[in-house]
Amino acid sequence: MKSLVGTKTRENLLKAFAGESQARNRYTIYAKTADKEGYKQIAKLFLETAENEYQHAKRFFNFLAEGLKEELPTVVEINAGYPVALGDTVENLKAAAAGEKEEWDELYPEFAEVAKEEGFPEVAAAFLKIAEVEQRHETRFIKLKENIEN
């Protein structure tokens, strides 16, 4: 992989890494809420999704480490917003679905296009593949929310 130094892809990978890392922790917190409310299956699915997010974060982090290897250790600053939402299980499922939708529908396709334009086809492919997974996560969270409400 060529160097990520000075690229927008570097910034996008770091944003994605931070976002996936935070989603993992949010879902772990949401699992505890679901468990306390008696939604054992939903708690399990939140934890399963948290593990998926860990794998996504790891993939993005590995791209960063490989593309910045000449500069390691290094500090890369980013400016980005991340969701903060905590409520009951229905509210948490709604927030989780919204976060997943933003990733697959907006962020990752945009990040993939930038990576492709900057000559990082493997990074672009990873963004698109992970976007597919995030879409399935959104669908699952919506269905679980609807099951509780109905």
Where do the PLM segments sit?
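Non-heme di-metal
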Residues: 1-150
